[in-house]
Amino acid sequence: MSLELPVFDISKPLSESSLTSLQDACKEWGFFYVTNHGVSRDMYKKLRRFSTGVFELEDEEKMKMGASNYTPRFIASPFFESLRVSGPDFYASAKSSVDAFSDQATDEEFSGLMKEYGEKMTKLCEKIMKAILSSFGDDLHHKYYESEFGNCHGYFRINNYTIPSDQEDDHHNGDEQDLIEGLGMHTDMSCITIVDQDDIGGLQVRTRDGIGLMDINPKDEALVVNVGDLLHAWTNGRLRSSQHRVILKRRGFVGNRFSLAFFWCFDDGKVVFAPDEVVGGCEGMRVFRSFKCGDYLRFRESNEKGKFEKVGDTVEDFARIEDRR
């Protein structure tokens, strides 16, 4: 079943009613769409073209990029591989990935494109975060944006999901049990994540009761935004970091899936602790203990590798005060 999420024109300040809708979407689902975001389809197509050339290389060549730049299959999923480009110097990060196997002209064009994309997405995250803070009222974005989110940084993953050829023959039966998880159920380790997915779709979010799954379909000219664990904790649990997954195979269609996911995070040294004004909206009960962002990221990384069929540990496991469940 498809989930109808609100769509926000992020090119202009949101009205009071739109801010209310934004707050409601973040509380109920932790997902929404944005339009007029400044990232053109032409840029997306160029990124896909360059990245496809990299993904088509032999595994031995791709592994030369190193573990910090390339995630091969069977780390997060047997069907998933990704390139990582980290800010704030997106150019240098991209260049370090492809230096090993590309010519200088291709290297510079690829790195320049990654730099442009990373900088656009960083500015977009800043704009979205200010809107989310404004949705709380009380001028929260003026009070806390610079002090709490001013040092946030971003990185993005270029994701390639591949259907195994030995599972392509039986896809016409429409059997829900025959679906393949390209990436298993998880939450994001970010403040916010922005996803640009192709027209194949496959993104699903788990309902609050933990029973159902809803499709978040691609929407023309729109990007998907979701709340991550760090913002979930910073808002004392008021905004939802939802469990979600990616499906590769569904009812009569088989193909590769391509997406760009930009993760906007606190710096590693940031102590995550909900402000009193935010806690007050939860009847004054503090739900999460304070924690250092880098400690949480290391906790997640140590608990996720190779566990394809398990929902990874989240900030709920790491920092929630036990008697507040």
UniProtKB/Swiss-Prot annotation:
2-oxoglutarate binds at R257. Induction: Down-regulated upon phosphate deficiency. GO terms for molecular function: dioxygenase activity; metal ion binding. InterPro entries: DIOX_N, IPNS-like_FE2OG_OXY, IPNS-like_sf, Iron_ascorbate_oxido_reductase, Oxoglu/Fe-dep_dioxygenase_dom. Coiled coil: none annotated. Highly expressed in elongation zone of lateral roots. One of its GO terms (biological process) is root hair elongation. Belongs to the iron/ascorbate-dependent oxidoreductase family. GA20OX subfamily. This is Gibberellin 20-oxidase-like protein.
